[in-house]
Design a protein with these regions (language model features):
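Peripheral terminal and linker regions in Fe-S/redox and tRNA-modifying enzymes
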Residues: 1-584
C-alpha cells in the first residue's frame, strides 16, 4: 500500500503545483486549511518552498537550483538582493545578523524567512535573472552536481558541462519524471580530483577510458545507489557500464532514472532511497533490465579509471592533488579562478551583493559554487589578481583560510530544520575561532575536514569527514542539553570509508575540548606527512577513542541549552517570540 505522501503526490505534483502556490500566496498562508497543510507543504517542496520548523509556521525557506553550481553574471546579485529585500526574520542571529544566503553541499543556495505572500515576487526577481527553484526539493531529481570548474579546469580529463546542462534541461526538466519515490541525486565529473563525490550519489559518472573498435576512447563509468543518512550510508556500486559519448551517457542515466521511477519502493518511505533499491535488486539485475527495456544500444562493460589520485575530500596529502577549490588556480585558458572560504557557507545579503560586484569588476561576473559551501570567482586575468586579493571582502571570506575554517561544513540545524536536534551554524562559526586560537596544527597540514550535521539525516555529510559530528541530546547536571556524537576517519576517494563513531552524546560545551584533544594527539603522534585519515587508520579506532577526551573549556556560546524546545534557538522572550511569529 502506497504511503500517504505518495497518495498526495499522485493527485497533484510537479509543475502543476506552481499555480497552487501562487493562489495561496495571493490569499495568504491562512487560506490553506489546517487539516490540508501537510499535503500542500509536501507538494510545495518540488518548487523549493519549505515551511520552516515548528513555531515558524508563517515563514518559508526557498532552495534554488542550477546545473553544477554555475551562477551566470548577475545571478548572485539577484539572489543577494532578494535576501536583502525579503529574507528578514523577527529575531536576529547573534553571529550573522539578519538577511543572508546559505550555500549548500549540493552547489546550491537556500533563502530563509520568506513569507508565502512574497514568493511570487521572489520568483519574478530571480527568474528575470535566470535563477529557478523548480525541482529543488521534495521527491524529485535534486540539484545536479559536478566539478565546479568544468570547462575551465586545465587538467580536466573528460568534458562534462554540456552533459550536465542537458541533464538540467531535458531530464530534470521533464515533468513526467518529477514524482520520484524519494529524492534522487545525480553527479558527473570529468576531473582528476573527483569533486562531484560520485560514490555518495544515487547515480554518478566518473572519468574512464576503454578500447573501443581498436581505439582508446575516454568517457565515463557508471555507479549507482550511493547515499548518506540514517546511519545507513552506502558507497555507490559499480554498474559495470562504460559510456563514451554525451548521447549514450545521457541515455544510460535517463534509463536508470526511469527504472527507479517505475520500480522504486513507494510503500515504505524509509526504504525508498535508491541505495536500498540497489541493495535489494543488485547491480546485475538492474543492468540487465536497463539493457532490455531502457536503452536501445548495447551496453559496454566498465572501462579503466583514469584518475591518477582521487584527492577531493579523500584524506590524501596535499602533494597528491587538490582536496578542495580554495585558493588561486590557473584555468585552461590562462585566466584564473579564486576560491573563497565562507565559514559554514553563510553569506550576508550585503556580502553576496558585494561579491557579485567584485566578480564583475575583476572577472567575467560568473560565480560557481562548490560542494564545500564555497564560491569561486571565475575568469580573472593574471594582471588583476593582486588587486582582487587586496579587496577587503577577501579578508573576511579568504582564499587562504586556517585549516579549521577551510575544512568545515555545517548543515542548517535547529535554526530552521524540524529534523535537527542541535543548533549548528552559529555554534560552529564560534567553535572555528576557538579552535584557531587554542589548538596548534602541524605546519604541513592545510585542512582538517570537520563536518557537522544536526541530525542523522547527514545533510552536512559528517560520515565523510576527518571528524564527523551528529547532533544529539543528552542529560547533563539533571537537564536536557544539546549534544553530539563524534566520529573519525571518514573520506571519499579510491577507497571510500565512513567515520567510526568513537564518542556518543557528548554535551555540546564539551565537544570543542574533545576535538582539541583529538587534534593535539594527531599532531603529537603522527608520522611525518601523515594526514588525519591516514593517522586514524594507522592508530586504530580503539586508540583514537582514548585520545578523544570530552571536557569543558573556556569556549562560550549563548545557545548551549536544548534549542529543540524553542521556536528559535536565539529567541530570548518565548512569549513575545510566539506572538511575533503568529502575528501574520
Amino acid at each position: 500500500m502506497a504511503s500517504k505522501k505518495e497518495a498526495w503526490k499522485s493527485e497533484l505534483y510537479g509543475d502543476e503545483v506552481r499555480e497552487k502556490i501562487e493562489e495561496f500566496a495571493e490569499k495568504g498562508v491562512d487560506a490553506i486549511p489546517e487539516e490540508e497543510r501537510d499535503k500542500w507543504f509536501t507538494r510545495f517542496k518540488f518548487w523549493g518552498v519549505f515551511q520552516q520548523r515548528t513555531g515558524q509556521d508563517s515563514y518559508f525557506m526557498m532552495r534554488l537550483t542550477n546545473a553544477n553550481g554555475v551562477l551566470e553574471p548577475g545571478q548572485l546579485r539577484a539572489i543577494g538582493e532578494v535576501a536583502r529585500d525579503y529574507a528578514s526574520g523577527p529575531v536576529e542571529n547573534p553571529e550573522f545578523g539578519d538577511a543572508w544566503v546559505d550555500l549548500t553541499t549540493r552547489q546550491s543556495i537556500q533563502l530563509h524567512w520568506l513569507e508565502l505572500e512574497d514568493i511570487p515576487a521572489v520568483w519574478e526577481k530571480l527568474e528575470a535573472a535566470g535563477v529557478s527553484s523548480r525541482s529543488a526539493g521534495g521527491d524529485t531529481m535534486r540539484n545536479i552536481t559536478g566539478c565546479p570548474v568544468a570547462g575551465r579546469d586545465k587538467h580536466e580529463l573528460v568534458e562534462s558541462q554540456p552533459l550536465l546542462d542537458r541533464f538540467q534541461a531535458d531530464l530534470r526538466g521533464n515533468d513526467a519524471l518529477s514524482n520520484m519515490p524519494r529524492k534522487f541525486n545525480i553527479s558527473v565529473t570529468g576531473c582528476r580530483e573527483g569533486c562531484a563525490q560520485d560514490s555518495i550519489n544515487d547515480v554518478g559518472l566518473e572519468p574512464a577510458k576503454k578500447e573501443v573498435d581498436g581505439e582508446t576512447v575516454t568517457g565515463f563509468n557508471v555507479r549507482v545507489g550511493g547515499g548518506l543518512g540514517s546511519r545507513k550510508p552506502r558507497v555507490a556500486r559499480d554498474l559495470d557500464v562504460f559510456v563514451a559519448d554525451e548521447e549514450r551517457a545521457y541515455e544510460v542515466v535517463r534509463g536508470f532514472v526511469e527504472l527507479y521511477h517505475e520500480h522504486g519502493n513507494r510503500d515504505v518511505r524509509a526504504r525508498a532511497r535508491s541505495r536500498f533499491f540497489v541493495d535489494e535488486w543488485g547491480t546485475e539485475k538492474i543492468r540487465d533490465l536497463l539493457q532490455e527495456e531502457y536503452v536501445d544500444f548495447e551496453l559496454r562493460s566498465a572501462g579503466e579509471n583514469i584518475r591518477d589520485e582521487y584527492t577531493y575530500n579523500a584524506g590524501r596529502p596535499e602533494s597528491a592533488g587538490k582536496h578542495d577549490h580554495v585558493g588561486v588556480h590557473e584555468q585552461a585558458d590562462g585566466d584564473y579562478y579564486v576560491g573563497l572560504s565562507v565559514a559554514v557557507g553563510r553569506l550576508t545579503a550585503s556580502d553576496a551583493i558585494e561579491l557579485a560586484d567584485i566578480a564583475d569588476e575583476y572577472g567575467s561576473g560568473e560565480v560557481r559554487l562548490t560542494r564545500r559551501q564555497n564560491p569561486l570567482l571565475m575568469d580573472v586575468p593574471e594582471e588583476k589578481l593582486d588587486d582582487l586579493l587586496a579587496e577587503p571582502l577577501l579578508g573576511k571570506h579568504t582564499p587562504v583560510p586556517n585549516p579549521f575554517q577551510r575544512g568545515t561544513v555545517a548543515c542548517t540545524g535547529t535554526e530552521f530544520c524540524s529534523l535537527a536536534l542541535t543548533e549548528t551554524k552559529a555554534r560552529t562559526a564560534r567553535m572555528l575561532r576557538w579552535l584557531r586560537d587554542n589548538v596548534d596544527v602541524p605546519d604541513d597540514v592545510s585542512q582538517l575536514k570537520i563536518h557537522y550535521s544536526g541530525c542523522t539525516a547527514d545533510c552536512g555529510q559528517a560520515n565523510t569527514a576527518d571528524i564527523g559530528l551528529f547532533g544529539m541530546r543528552a542529560q547533563k547536571d539533571g537537564e536536557m542539553v544539546e549534544a553530539m556524537d563524534i566520529g573519525v576517519g571518514g573520506g571519499i576517494g579510491e577507497d571510500p570509508s565512513f567515520v567510526e563513531w568513537v564518542r556518543q552524546r557528548i554535551p555540546a560545551d564539551e565537544v570543542p575540548g574533545a576535538i582539541a584533544s583529538l587534534v593535539e594527539a594527531f599532531a603529537e603522534r603522527r608520522e611525518p606527512g601523515q594526514t588525519f585519515r591516514e593517522w586514524v587508520e594507522a592508530e586504530g579506532t580503539e586508540a583514537v577513542t582514548e585520545y578523544c577526551v570530552p571536557e569543558e573549556t573556556d569556549f562560550e556560546a549563548p545557545y548551549m541549552h536544548d534549542a529543540k524546545q524553542s521556536w528559535y534557538p536565539f529567541a530570548e522572550d518565548e512569549a513575545q517570540s510566539e506572538q511575533t511569529v503568529t502575528s501574520d
